Design a protein with these regions (language model features):
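Active-site microenvironments in enzyme catalytic cores
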Residues: 1-104
Length: 104
């Protein structure tokens, strides 16, 4: 946490969203790694599916590729380390929450 504290970001949990439209890819698509990185690693994620009205309508799995060497240069580069074209594979299915959601 020291690098985050140096730039004024506290140790609280954060919700992170992918911004570039092209960052997410579907099943079977090639996952992209930025050419400026030599050290990337996958991060399994639980992904909420949101409709155009902003309502959570389902969930899927994601494999979010993080550029560790870019992130390590500065906490201010976290966005660049996470937001890259084709850096988040989603699927292969979406569990819709039509009738409510339980863990069973």
């Amino acid at each position: 946490w020291s690098q985050y504290l140096e730039v004024g970001i506290g140790p609280d949990a954060e919700i992170f969203t992918k911004s570039p439209v092209l960052s997410a890819v579907g099943p079977g698509a090639k996952v992209g790694v930025h050419p400026m990185s030599t050290w990337s690693n996958p991060e399994p994620e639980a992904v909420m599916v949101v409709n155009a009205r902003g309502r959570i309508v389902g969930a899927t799995l994601g494999n979010d590729v993080n550029l560790r060497d870019v992130e390590g240069r500065s906490a201010l580069l976290l966005g660049r380390a996470k937001d890259n074209n084709a850096s988040c594979a989603l699927g292969p299915l979406i569990r819709l929450f039509d009738g409510g959601f339980t863990l069973e």
